Amino acid sequence: MKDIKKVTLIGLGAMGVFFAPRISEKLGADFRILADGARKERLERKGVTVNTINYRFPIITPDVEGDPADLVIIAVKGYDLEQAIRDIKNQVGKDTIILSVLNGVESEKQIAAVYGS
């Protein structure tokens, strides 16, 4: 198994903010949040506050191409999963691990239908 050096997270709700500070502390600029539109603007302007600490994570948009992430964490609500699957396209390479932290196993099936298992 290859070392995980670059991580992309999509979804900064309850699950996402649990992982984000911890991973960011370890990886710095190699950890980034995938967001666009108003959400991206808000995160760049205000950051995200977790337990009274404000964090400013690097933000990338879905259209950014380049080196794929070693790990993509999907932490969106179930109703946003289809869009998230499309949005992570440029972050996924042949060796990328995709981790879904949504409840249930249906999300894994939907992701595998697009990216393989």
Go through the PLM ranges and name each one.
Residues 1-56:
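NAD(P)+-binding Rossmann beta1-loop-alpha1 motif at the extreme N-terminus of oxidoreductases
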Residues 53-55, 60-117:
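Rossmann-like NAD(P)(H) cofactor-binding subdomain of soluble oxidoreductases
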